[in-house]
Amino acid sequence: MGTPFKMERGVKYRDAAKTSIIPVKNIDPNQELLKKPEWMKIKLPANSAKIESIKNGMRRHGLHSVCEEASCPNLHECFNHGTATFMIMGAICTRRCPFCDVAHGKPLPLDKDEPKKLAETIQDMKLKYVVITSVDRDDLPDRGAGHFAECVKEIRALNPGIKIEILVPDFRGRVEQAIEILKENPPDVFNHNLENVPRLYKEIRPGADYEWSLKLLKEFKAVFPDIPTKSGIMVGLGETNEEILQVMQDLRDHGVTMLTLGQYLQPSRHHLPVARYVHPTEFDMFREKANEMGFEHAACGPFVRSSYHADLQASGGLVK
């Protein structure tokens, strides 16, 4: 017998080191991959000065962006426009979803100064709309809800008039506690992603539960009826269009009014492969269906991600 795998605290496990310890799915890194269609080609900006400026600002304050940690395809566009999605509570996630490029492992203790550093960075960047997300922190008693609340509090104290969107984990087993903690410092938009369809959850989101996520969205809306709730879905992981439409309807049935829907892209050969590339006309169909279902805002397109042009979506602009 081999020696059992033991993780070291604070070490980032990525790619094969991460996905090899997922019991549900064996991923063959040598499998033949789908060719990326023309509409999925990204044109990089000629000038990277703004991009490097934001990266350096993050490093200087000891902060992380989900844009970098999750290898988002929109990083160059967003950073070039001076926007970023901040990722709090470290860069090591206690979950190991095989679609995600964020590192897995045993996280370090929370940085108690992070909320203040985050608020100061946002002030320096002169942001009017900010998205705050996090890794999953199943090691924390409140799953990180208190840290979210403290970040919102500090950001508002230094940045009057700012709009804050939080993209939260599922607070596994602590939904009621998390919502209670957020009562003192609620966000302007509450976002939690379903990611994909329930049939594929065991394979795509090990450790998560479709009904838990719907419950979180519903219960937050019940406590804060005037705060928009939002959720995101990836396509191209083996789901059908009919299943996606059912997830969209489930979201509406649970009070969600804002939707993001984009194409899944494989971060590396050690992650889940792309099962299909969805044509832009299909995304247009999903947006039309979302409007028919009663979503107030639906951003649907190949490169759409949860926080992609979040400020524009929150103000009612078209994002695709």
From Swiss-Prot:
Q: How is the cofactor bound?
A: Binds 2 [4Fe-4S] clusters per subunit. One cluster is coordinated with 3 cysteines and an exchangeable S-adenosyl-L-methionine.
Pathway named in the protein's UniProt entry? Protein modification; protein lipoylation via endogenous pathway; protein N(6)-(lipoyl)lysine from octanoyl-[acyl-carrier-protein]: step 2/2
Q: Which residues bind [4Fe-4S] cluster 2?
A: 93, 97, 100
Cofactor(s) listed: [4Fe-4S] cluster
Q: SMART domains, from UniProt?
A: Elp3 (SM00729)
Classification via InterPro entries? Aldolase_TIM, Elp3/MiaA/NifB-like_rSAM, LIAS_N, Lipoyl_synth, rSAM
Residues at which [4Fe-4S] cluster 1 binds: 67, 72, 78, 307
- A Pfam family name for this chain? Radical_SAM
User: Is Iron among this UniProt entry's keywords?
Assistant: yes
What residues does the Radical SAM core domain cover?
79-296
- Taking the first listed entry, what is the main subcellular location of this protein, grouped into a coarse class? cytoplasm
Name the Gene3D superfamilies for this protein. Answer: Aldolase class I (3.20.20.70)
Give the GO molecular function terms.
4 iron, 4 sulfur cluster binding; lipoate synthase activity; metal ion binding
Spell out the family assignment given in the record's similarity comment: Belongs to the radical SAM superfamily. Lipoyl synthase family.
Designated name of the protein: Lipoyl synthase
To which species is this protein native? Glaesserella parasuis serovar 5 (strain SH0165)
Classification from the root reads: Bacteria, Pseudomonadati, Pseudomonadota, Gammaproteobacteria, Pasteurellales
